[in-house]
Structure formats: C-alpha cells, structure tokens
Design a protein with these regions (language model features):
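Glycine-rich phosphate/pyrophosphate-binding beta-alpha loops
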Residues: 35-45, 89-102
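Short beta->alpha transition motifs characteristic of CBS
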Residues: 30-35, 88-92, 157-161
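Internal helical hairpin/lid segments
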Residues: 71-73, 83, 92
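Non-catalytic pre-domain segments flanking phosphatase-related domains
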Residues: 92-149
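Active-site neighborhood of HAD-like aspartate-dependent phosphohydrolases
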Residues: 142-147, 151-174
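Acidic active-site catalytic centers that drive phospho-/nucleotidyl reactions
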Residues: 74, 87, 149-152
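Phosphate-binding site of ATP-dependent enzymes
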Residues: 1-65, 76-84
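Short, small/polar residue-rich loop motifs at catalytic or cofactor-binding pockets
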Residues: 13, 69, 141-144
Length: 175
C-alpha cells in the first residue's frame, strides 16, 4: 500500500491571474479569492491587491518556468496562515473574466505575444467581484397544456419573486 500524505489546508483559497510578456517579464499578477466553487470553477470570486507574499511567489514561479502569455497559479492558506502552492497552469483560468472586466484581455494579450508584438497593460481595477451561475436547461418531447405551481416557496421564495420560475412560465406560455 502506498500513501500520499498532504498538509491540511483549512484556510482561504486563491487564484492569481498572471501575464508574462514575450521577453519573459511578469507584467501582471492579480489575485482573487475563490469564495464559491462549483465543478472546480470559482463561480464567486473577489479580487484584491496582491501582498508581498503573493508577488514573491508569482515572481519566483515566473523565473523558474518559461511562460509566454496568460497563466495562473492557485494557493491555499494553511493553519498558520501561510500560502501553499496548489497548482500552476499555462492557460486561461475559468474566472479570468474578472481581469477582462478590469480591462486586461488575457487571450488577446497572449495572441499579441505570439505575433511578436510588445504590449502594455492598463489595469482599471474596476472589477472587484464576480458571481455567476451554471444553469442546466433541457428540451423534452413531452406535450402538455397546463402547468401547476404552488405560490408559497415556488412563485415566491423568502418573500421574493422566483425569477427563474417566472422565466419558465413565460417560456411555457409563449412556446
């Protein structure tokens, strides 16, 4: 029997979105806290200013690996509040849209790198929080003329209109 022994990491989890230019210089490192995760993707994430520890880790990774464009790494804090590296990936992260909303278009910058263009980065830092949802929708061949729904805890939930149900009812009526 072989065992993998890992440190318990009870603290917050972070992703740091990075961009390295075609000359190997780290030009952008923007951390965000992974506040809610679904299917491995952060669906609620808050951006914050990088501290010295995060910048040091980003520069160290960048000096050891040959990046050309967008990449990211993930950290988690241990019981003592110290950062522990969990993952490094040379690709666009699922929630890198936070950087895009702040004016930093990582896919485009990466393409410019590949075309040999020098780039400048202007971070507007106007996107602090992203919250998104994955919704499944299905089509069926079941035919029906009437839909019954309960008012309490269906049409209204916690005193507010259930907008997803209302969307379905409008769709059913207009189909």
């Amino acid at each position: 029997v072989e065992y993998a022994i890992c440190e318990y990491l009870p603290g917050d989890e972070f992703t740091v979105d990075c961009f390295t230019d075609r000359h190997g210089q780290l030009r952008f490192a923007a951390p965000r806290q992974r506040m809610r995760i679904r299917a491995g993707i952060s669906v609620r994430s808050r951006r914050f200013a990088p501290d010295e520890g995060i910048l040091s880790i980003a520069l160290d990774i960048n000096s050891r690996l040959a990046f050309n464009g967008a990449w990211f790494f993930q950290l988690k804090k241990n019981a003592a509040g110290e950062y522990r590296l969990m993952e490094i990936a040379p690709r666009i992260a699922g929630t890198m849209c936070v950087a895009r909303n702040a004016g930093v278009n990582m896919p485009m910058l990466t393409l410019f790198n590949m075309f040999g263009c020098d780039v400048g980065i202007i971070d507007n830092a106007n996107a602090e929080l992203v919250d998104r949802a994955f919704i499944s929708r299905f089509e069926t061949d079941i035919s029906y003329d009437t839909v019954y729904v309960d008012f309490d805890d269906t049409v209204t939930v916690r005193g507010k209109v259930n907008s997803i149900l209302m969307m379905y009812l409008y769709q059913a009526r207009n189909a």
